[in-house]
């Protein structure tokens, strides 16, 4: 097992240039020295969950607000550009018990300092069954939700959800209820984990994803692959030409999709 690869040691981080979103200011609702997540993905840049939740605890609404306000004021005063405020960080942002209230506060601050900037949430979809969380996701500009495989065994192998009741069937059904506003992100990879082959790029996998996408009717699908080191060492990046071929096949089925590498 590798050590943690990337942790964000503050509540607000960046801005950084995101290959998917542009100039992005990050919001980390998890501990500054550990990871809390409802998945334990083989490819997570923050490492496996077993490496620890840290000691700092979750930031309060007041801390998030104060830190974000200070950063936005500084950027605005310096005439800097900002495309998006992105909830990501050290784990699953929707696990924060005050996620809906924090969303509303971030919207308020965005409107005050960078009204043209978007607000994005990168989520693994595990908390969309909570109506308060789903309603909060409906209030942001880019509600970006994960679906790495539409085949149950593959999803469990890659994403390793903590909740045994989290299934592909349930999440696809709930994603449909966003009625075309959700953006779906899918990580493409292959390799092996503890002697078991891992590959969500096969024809069977792509057909299952197409069926799921057509059912969900997302605003867009973001198709991407590994960009940093991963806790599972035996994973292989899917290169741009192959990503484009997969995206073309999905697009031909009537799905709006964009490959990133």
Model regions: which residues?
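Short hydrophobic-acidic sequence motifs that mark active-site Asp/Glu residues
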Residues: 24-26, 84, 144, 183
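Auxiliary Fe-S-binding modules of radical SAM enzymes
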Residues: 2-20, 69, 190-261
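N-terminal [4Fe-4S]-dependent radical SAM core
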Residues: 1-42, 47-59, 70, 74-80
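Short glycine-centered, acidic/aromatic-flanked micro-motifs in structured strand/loop junctions
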Residues: 29, 87-89, 186, 225
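Conserved Radical SAM active-site core
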Residues: 43-139
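Conserved AdoMet/S-adenosylmethionine-binding subsite of the radical SAM
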Residues: 95-224, 229-236
């Amino acid at each position: 097992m590798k050590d943690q690869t990337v942790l964000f040691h503050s509540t607000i981080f960046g801005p950084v240039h995101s290959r998917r979103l542009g100039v992005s200011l990050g919001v980390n609702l998890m501990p500054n020295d550990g990871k809390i997540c409802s998945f334990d993905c083989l490819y997570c840049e923050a490492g496996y969950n077993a490496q620890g939740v840290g000691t700092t605890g979750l930031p309060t609404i007041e801390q998030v607000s104060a830190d974000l306000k200070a950063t936005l004021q500084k950027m605005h005063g310096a005439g800097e550009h900002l495309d998006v405020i992105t909830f990501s960080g050290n784990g699953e942002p929707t696990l924060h018990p005050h996620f809906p209230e924090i969303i509303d506060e971030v919207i308020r601050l965005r409107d005050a300092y960078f009204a043209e900037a978007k607000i994005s949430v990168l989520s693994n979809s595990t908390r969309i069954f909570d109506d308060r969380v789903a309603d909060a996701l409906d209030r942001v500009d880019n509600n970006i939700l994960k679906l790495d495989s539409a085949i149950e065994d593959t999803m469990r192998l890659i994403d390793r959800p903590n909740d045994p009741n989290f299934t592909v069937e349930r999440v696809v059904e709930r994603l449909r209820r966003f009625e075309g506003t959700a953006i779906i992100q899918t990580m493409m990879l292959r390799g092996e984990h503890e002697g078991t082959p891992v590959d969500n790029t096969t024809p069977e996998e792509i057909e299952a994803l197409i069926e799921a996408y057509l059912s969900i009717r997302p605003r867009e699908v973001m198709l991407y692959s590994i960009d940093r080191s991963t806790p599972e060492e035996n994973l292989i990046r899917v290169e741009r030409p192959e990503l484009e071929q997969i995206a073309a096949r999905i697009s031909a089925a009537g799905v709006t999709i964009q490959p990133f590498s």
